[in-house]
């Protein structure tokens, strides 16, 4: 079990518990996500990025604007972004919608993450 401490996670859990108390139980399925600003840097994480067996970097680390896509068992498990808010937003849509991108697609700057994130699941 992972311990997640963020405002969003607390709010999502509160809604789930309130629904249970009101007699409308449902499983907790919210996608964990987090952000923090550290000086000039914005760090954003979507999904659970622990236990990965492969990572793919999109963007240039040297530029200070990049995302690391984390894969577990060939499936996208999460993304860690630094100063790439669009990657974070698209990854949240991908992960919460059960959509996948291959490591090759994630690494390819010409691949349209937005289109993949908004496409209907197969």
Positions of PLM-derived features:
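Alpha-helix boundary/capping residues
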Residues: 21, 50, 95-98, 110-113
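A general structural signal for short secondary-structure boundary/capping elements
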Residues: 82, 90-93, 112-117
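Flexible domain-boundary/linker segments
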Residues: 30-31, 91, 108
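Mid-to-C-terminal Rossmann-like scaffold of FAD/NAD(P)H-dependent oxidoreductases
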Residues: 1-85
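Cysteine/selenocysteine-centered motifs that mediate thiol-based redox chemistry or coordinate metal-sulfur cofactors
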Residues: 100-122
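Short amphipathic alpha-helical patches
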Residues: 37-45, 97, 114-119
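Short, charged/polar low-complexity linear motifs in solvent-exposed/disordered segments
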Residues: 62, 94-97, 120-121
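A short, polar/charged loop-to-alpha-helix boundary motif
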Residues: 85-104
């Amino acid at each position: 079990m992972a311990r997640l401490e963020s405002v969003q996670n607390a709010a999502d859990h509160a809604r789930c518990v309130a629904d249970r108390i009101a007699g409308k139980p449902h499983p907790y399925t919210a996608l964990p996500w987090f952000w923090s600003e550290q000086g000039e840097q914005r760090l954003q994480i979507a999904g659970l990025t622990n236990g990965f067996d492969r990572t793919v970097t999109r963007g240039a680390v040297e530029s200070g604007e990049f995302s690391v896509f984390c894969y577990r068992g060939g499936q996208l498990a999460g993304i860690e972004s630094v100063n790439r808010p669009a990657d974070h937003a698209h990854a949240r849509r991908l992960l919460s919608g059960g959509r996948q991108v291959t490591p090759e697609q994630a690494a390819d700057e010409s691949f349209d993450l937005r289109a993949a994130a908004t496409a209907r699941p197969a």
